[in-house]
A protein has these predicted regions:
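N-terminal Lys/Arg-rich, disordered targeting/topogenic segments
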Residues: 1-14
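Hydrophobic, ordered structural segments
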Residues: 118-157, 189, 223-261, 332, ...
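Solenoidal tandem-repeat scaffolds enriched in leucines and small polar residues
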Residues: 172-185, 189-260, 269, 279
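Conserved functional hotspot residues at active sites or interaction interfaces
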Residues: 20-83, 144-189, 248-298, 358-416, ...
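Post-signal-peptide, soluble extracytosolic/periplasmic N-terminal scaffold domains
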Residues: 42, 52-56, 85-127, 134-154, ...
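Short acidic, flexible loop segments centered on an aromatic residue
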Residues: 83, 87-106, 185-208, 244, ...
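Intrinsically disordered, low-complexity Pro/Gly/Ser/Thr-rich segments with frequent PxxP/GP/PP motifs
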Residues: 51, 101-130, 134, 206-235, ...
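Hydrophobic alpha-helical membrane segments, chiefly transmembrane helices and signal peptide h-regions
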Residues: 19-39, 96, 240-242, 305, ...
Length: 500
């Protein structure tokens, strides 16, 4: 099948109208409630869709310790540095250990004390040499969070850290055009070997290299696969699936874009499962920007998708959702600019699979690629959407946000009910609302761009809303580069009641 055949089929109207958004959201909440009920009853249900968010979350449960598994930092280039930010929002100090892993080297362990209401920054590359270095953060107590930061000449990047290793990992997007560097970073944090099967999908075919079948990752080590060397050279899209047949692991993707419409650097954690819905808080139809949704359907059945664009406008003026066919075992490219009725400006995007009555909707993985052009240069951002079950009234950004810009955060209202949000920062006085952001109006089924004032010091950011929301950060890329890098904040799960 060629690239044109892989491109989606878009219809002008579909089964779901904007007027039905309330019913759509309520049905999702009912599904989540049923899943939780089944879990309590120990019911066993076979499904391709993981019933819990396939992304990192902040747990409200009391724990003796909390672990974070970070996806990796390039270690063999002196122009690139990396750090782990450990955040403590509580009123008491806590102790943590940061373990660095590489290939062919012994783990390096550092003990850290994080003072109350503050952060600690740990140099990833200190004391270890390896092509890629991954870290494990173990916190005594359940209140701390961690994120990874990479300072790269092609653009700085913040990556989420996983709550735990998993058997399956997915990336819908990947790019090796113009000899761009696409590394899949495999981290085995355990004392036993992990055995994986790695396959990838391009616009032309699905490939399962024999070298990557039964591929062994030694204990407590990190191995990076250069996808061009694995047979995916100069490909406009390289979707990757990693399955562990023995053990579990953490998988990240390091991308250095060198041309063919993309420039910059990103590092991201993969999706640890499939989801029947993906939410994006920063859709863009702006001068100089192009937007593409990259959809991986690794299942054996074709999937029908609904792609809804929401911006809080009058339902009578909202565009109808697009209907998309994602063929089985394929990657589908959806250029939102091809739809004439997509609203100008910024909007939220909801991608959901459509199941037959009485049949559970299949799972997919969706990433969003935005290229922002200013003059003769481009800045590329890639972000995985928020999966089913991730909507929450409380989100945290452990490493903070970029200040002095008018789009530091985009917040999408996941309900048809008007709400408000409060944006606070953790500091010496605890959690304190940022001036001007104490009560920001959030339109029903709409989104709001949050400007963070210049001069705000580094610190964990907390977003509290009166309705379930999705929160995405838009970060400066540093080095006087154009555009933004994008990463979600972390949802608190289960979603706290308003005022708790």
């Amino acid at each position: 099948m060629n690239e044109n055949q892989r491109l989606l089929s878009v219809q002008n109207r579909t089964h779901l109208s904007v007027r039905q958004l309330a019913v759509f959201v309520l049905s999702l909440l009912m599904v989540g409630a049923m899943v939780l009920t089944n879990q309590r009853d120990n019911a066993v249900v076979e499904s391709l869709v993981t019933p819990v968010p396939v992304m990192p979350v902040v747990s409200v449960d009391q724990r003796i310790s909390t672990s974070w598994f970070c996806p990796g930092v390039p270690g063999n280039d002196g122009t690139i540095s990396g750090s782990i930010i450990v955040s403590n929002p509580s009123d008491a100090d806590f102790n943590a250990t940061v373990t660095r892993l590489g290939v062919g080297v012994s783990p390096v362990v550092t003990a850290v004390t994080v003072a109350a209401r503050s952060q600690a920054v740990v140099n990833v590359k200190e004391g270890i040499e390896s092509p890629f270095i991954s870290t494990i953060v173990e916190i005594l107590g359940g209140v701390g969070t961690a994120e990874q930061f990479i300072n790269h000449p092609a653009g700085n990047s913040v990556a989420q850290c996983a709550n735990e290793p998993a058997t399956d990992w997915y990336f819908a997007d990947g790019f090796t055009g113009a000899d761009s560097l696409d590394h899949i970073v495999l981290t085995n944090p355990y004392s036993d070997s992990t055995v994986v099967d790695v396959s990838f999908v391009t616009t032309e075919s699905t490939r399962e290299p024999s070298r990557l079948h039964g591929f062994v990752i030694p204990p407590r080590s990190v191995i990076a696969l250069n996808m061009a060397d694995e047979g995916a050279r100069n490909e406009p899209v390289v979707a990757v699936e990693v399955h562990a047949s023995a053990g579990k692991l953490v998988v990240g993707r390091s991308q250095h874009y060198l041309g063919d419409g993309r420039l910059g650097y990103t590092m991201a954690l993969g999706a640890s499962g499939l989801s029947s819905e993906w939410w994006f808080a920063d859709g863009e139809k702006l001068d100089g920007s192009t937007e593409q949704l990259v959809i991986l359907n690794p299942t054996r059945s074709d999937a029908t998708l609904s792609v809804m664009f929401v911006n809080g406008a009058n339902p009578d003026t909202q565009s109808e959702p697009a209907s998309v066919i994602a063929p089985a075992g394929s990657v589908t490219l959806f250029d939102t600019g091809t739809l004439p009725n997509v609203p100008n400006g910024r909007y939220g995007i909801i991608v959901s699979t459509v199941g037959e009555p009485g049949v559970e909707a299949p799972g997919i993985v969706v990433e969003q690629v935005i290229n922002r052009r200013v003059g003769n240069t481009v800045g590329t951002s890639v972000v995985l959407g928020a999966p089913m079950g991730a909507m929450s009234t409380v989100w945290v950004a452990p490493s903070g946000v970029s200040s002095g810009i008018d789009d530091a955060m985009l917040i999408l209202n996941a309900t048809p009910i008007e709400g408000t949000v409060t944006v606070s920062q953790i500091g010496p006085a605890g959690e304190v609302a940022i001036a001007g952001l104490e009560s920001v109006l959030l339109p029903a089924s709409g989104l709001v761009s949050i400007p963070v004032p210049a001069g705000i010091s580094n610190g964990e950011i907390v977003v509290r809303a009166t309705v379930p929301v999705v929160v995405q950060r838009m970060l400066l890329r540093g080095h006087e580069l154009t555009g933004r890098s994008a990463v979600l904040a972390l949802p608190t799960i289960p979603s706290p009641e308003v005022g708790s």
